[in-house]
Regions:
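Pan-zinc metallopeptidase signature
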Residues: 97-168
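Auxiliary, metal-adjacent structural segments of Zn-dependent hydrolase domains
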Residues: 1-37, 58, 75-89
């Protein structure tokens, strides 16, 4: 189910869309059609993630790749910012890390800093958002670059999509 409109959680969290209780909530205030498509695909990725947790995270490979990327990013950030102490070990969503990246660093600056490490600034937020950005890249991005930059994530997505296709 997809609901389009203005929802309190969007204003509270300053977001355009979210996935909750098997439904996607998306704002009707979009820059253009592609912006809405990107938001929908991103939230579909969270639905796929929720229903395939063991496959995605069971072997720990994706978490290790994510943390390795955070460890590459941390010294770059620490040149100008006070990086949270658990930044290099915490792969789960953490409000203080999210606030640090969004409010202190800012996504414009972070997009410049994370080039070649993460596919986008938002992918640095948590392993779940890393997964979601990878999902977007498979459908809307440069697959070859993504495959080189995020090999574990790319392989997980390719295997899961193949399995889902075979079972439908």
């Amino acid at each position: 189910m997809i609901y389009v409109g203005q929802f309190p959680e969007m204003k509270e969290r300053d977001i355009n869309a979210y996935y909750e209780n098997d439904a996607i909530y998306i704002t009707n205030k979009q820059d253009d059609e592609m912006d809405m498509i990107e938001d929908i695909i991103h939230e579909i990725s969270h639905a796929v993630e929720q229903h395939n947790q063991e496959f995605i995270y069971g072997d720990g490979g994706l978490q290790r790749e994510f943390i390795a990327k955070r460890r590459r990013l941390s010294p770059l950030l620490s040149q100008k910012y006070d990086v949270p102490s658990d930044f290099n070990i915490n792969f789960e969503y953490d409000r203080s890390i999210d606030d640090f990246l969004f409010r202190d660093v800012g996504y414009d600056a972070l997009n410049q800093i994370c080039v070649g490490i993460f596919p986008s600034a938002y992918a640095c937020t948590s392993v779940s958002e890393y997964w979601a950005k990878g999902f977007e890249e498979v459908f809307l991005g440069d697959k070859d670059n993504f495959k080189q930059q995020c090999p574990v994530l790319y392989k997980k997505l390719a295997l899961l999509l193949k399995e889902l296709k075979e079972n439908t």
